[in-house]
Regions:
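Mixed-charge, Lys/Arg-enriched low-complexity segments
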Residues: 1-22, 81-116
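Short, conserved beta-strand/beta-arch hydrophobic-aromatic motifs that form part
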Residues: 54-82
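Negatively charged, low-complexity tracts enriched in Asp/Glu with abundant Ser/Thr
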Residues: 2-61
Length: 116
């Protein structure tokens, strides 16, 4: 008999445009405050329930893929996947405190390791 298992890295819901704007603004404000000079431009884009965050630098014509956030109805409790260049895909991850859910800013901090 099949059984159901909770996965924080599946499903989700598409955030409304106002929520998308707030999430984008939060990420950009956090990046400008804490990582100024380490990137030229941060790109935040949405596709369905997912929010992709990339950074552009002068040293590379291609973007640095940082993280992919998943919106589950609460912009303060999102899940995320870290982009691994060794496998060239997003891998589900947990936040620094071990939780599956956290803020967009906390997810950006983890992805920003590529900016150092």
């Amino acid at each position: 008999m099949p059984y159901w298992v909770y996965s924080p890295h599946s499903g989700g819901q598409k955030p409304k445009p106002a929520v998308q704007d707030r999430i984008r603004a939060r990420i950009l404000k956090h990046a400008a405050k804490n990582y100024a000079g380490k990137y030229d431009r941060i790109d935040v884009r949405f596709r369905g329930a997912l929010c992709y965050v990339d950074a552009y630098t002068k040293s590379s014509p291609d973007p640095w893929r940082l993280v992919r956030l998943r919106y589950n109805g609460d912009e303060n409790s999102m899940t995320f996947a870290f982009y691994t260049y060794s496998h060239e895909k997003y891998e589900p991850s947990c936040f620094a405190d071990g939780s599956d859910h956290g803020t967009p800013e906390d997810a950006f901090d983890i992805g920003a390791l590529y900016l150092n």
